[in-house]
Amino acid sequence: MVRQLLRRSILWMGVLVLGVALPASPAFGQRGAQNGEWRSYGGDAGSTKYSPLDAIDETNVQNLQVAWTWQSVDYDRQAEDPDVRFNSVLLATPLKVGNALFTSTNLGQAAAIDPVTGETLWVYNSLAEGTNAGRGRGTRGLAYWTDGSDERLLLVSGEHLVALGTRTGELYPEFGENGKVDLRQDMGPRLQRYAWNAAPLVCGDVVIVGAAMSDSPTRQEATPGYVRGYDVITGQLRWRFNPVPQPGQAGNETWEDGSWEYSGNANVWTLMSADEELGYVYLPVSTPTNDWYGGHRLGDNLFAESLVTLDCATGERVWHFQMVHHGLWDYDNPAAPILVDITVDGRPIKAVVQVTKQGFTYVFDRVTGEPVWPIVELAVPPSLVPGERASPTQPFPTWPLPFERQGITVNDLIDFTPELRAEAIEILGGYVFGPMFTPPSVRSDDPDETQGTIQLPGWVGGADWNGAAVDPETQILYVPSVTAPIVVALVAPDPDASDFNYVRGAPRSVQGPRGLPLVKPPWGRITAIDLNTGDHLWMVPNGEGIRDHEALQGLDLPKLGTPGRPAPLLTKTLLFIGEGSPSMLAMPRFAGGKMFRAYDKDTGEVLWEMELPAGTTGAPMTYMADGKQYIVVGIGEANRPAEFIALSLP
């Protein structure tokens, strides 16, 4: 049965309760990584990023040291052929199964690594097999499947899905054609090139993949962001979900004037989660074509910018909730939904949690799709762009409270000194600004008039692909986020180059006075939220932030927070997180740092920190090997090799 929540009642003032979570029978929920292993990108299929390991704890964490480093085997291919190029930002998080770590690389290779020494055990050579990633950016990792006797690794390598043996890295010949499935197939005639940089997800005997697509295409006609499920043994396509409903399908009416016929995107570019007990996969769906102007696709545009739940075996939609109607802000759902069992007012609930770029924490019953706390439709500003019609309302969770600053006013501007504040006010005056969901605006040709709309949070979040982590024992969620406004300035394109009425032009970022951020700190933060009550427990800046700017000299400033893309790792007693590599975040300026820290989960106090050779690029993970606990994370920068660094006690 498909649960439909297709259109909301409009609420101009007050509160509209969309649903109350139904009691759920107690069941074994998402418990994090088990048995000292790390079998999924997020530790488990529910993306908790949690391990109950406690050999490293608050009493000895200060003794952590580097155990080994592993340089990406992509450099071996480059040594063989100097023309080989790839990104030095290693996105992957390795899996730990049995006596090996398994990782993907930026050339679409895979490798097995000794978990104690960091020695390479085997390599799947994507260049030799003809499946390498053309732009050398790679994916965030692998998926692992076993039925208890057989086991295999699933990897998106360039435009192919491949199945590899865990012992040797050799292709399974019965999977697809000689071990490979061509992912360009079944994507429709509009596809020019397939790419994806997340990690496959296994649910039962199905491996599920999404797709990456341009946020700023030049044509209205685009490929829909199909999500596909393949048989893990044969590679046969089991199902294909189209996020743009076709005639006769629920939601098609939300694409006015036949815009469903040519519109695309609404893809899943990021990581997914699954409840294998229920047999459900949870899709964080992104924005439709294009991200900033929707005059050619009027309507709510289901199932874009929604959390969509599918049956893993059939691809049938079970329930959905749309977080943004008629998206104009690139507020796609950026992170894997998190599955956790909570208790609210005495009621056990099998929950799914979606953190967003807007700084919201949406919490639903993952069985029924009912919100755990009321979600209200509130009026938002209209669009003044010719041909555009913004949604009159957007859904706002009433609880938990936002974990990021939303919208921008004069009161949000930097105020370290009166001079800096005055300069910030002058800068703000050159733009349209207001509450969150203020639509994009057309840039004036007159430099003394508006130069676009300042959007906060921007397209970098709030939250992003690095997501959040949850402790399934305490039901406390830990969310890293950034405060980084952007500018959305629409311009009329050359009609020979684009058939859109408007596309996004320059400027795209806004600097504050003297190159400092425009808004008050913290610019990078961590927020702890009790999911049983929805209460915020603590918030701390992550990192010192800017310290050497000449305008700040002589000021007694607290920690300002380092904006970045660090992913969290939870253990029994500690929260580990870096600052993110500068290469992971193009804006704001001063983004990223090399510090890696352990926080007290109860208080947010920093218990330990280490300066790494480079900033973190992937999500950290932990495991046991030979009786010792290790923590491994990818690091790298533009001028430094991509590598893993492993930490352990002496």
Language model features with spans:
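Structural motif
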Residues: 167, 218-224, 304, 360-362, ...
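Beta-propeller blade signature
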Residues: 169, 223-236, 300-315, 367-368, ...
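Extracytoplasmic beta-rich repeat domains
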Residues: 70-93, 123-148, 177-199, 242-271, ...
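Mature N-terminal segment immediately following signal peptide/propeptide cleavage
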Residues: 31-77, 96
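Loop/turn-rich, solvent-exposed surfaces of beta-rich toroidal or solenoidal domains
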Residues: 341, 515-527, 531-535, 539-544, ...
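Bacterial N-terminal signal peptides
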Residues: 9-24
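Phosphate/diphosphate-binding loops
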Residues: 336-385, 636, 646-649
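Repeat-blade elements of multi-bladed beta-propeller folds
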Residues: 38-42, 86-109, 134-161, 192-219, ...
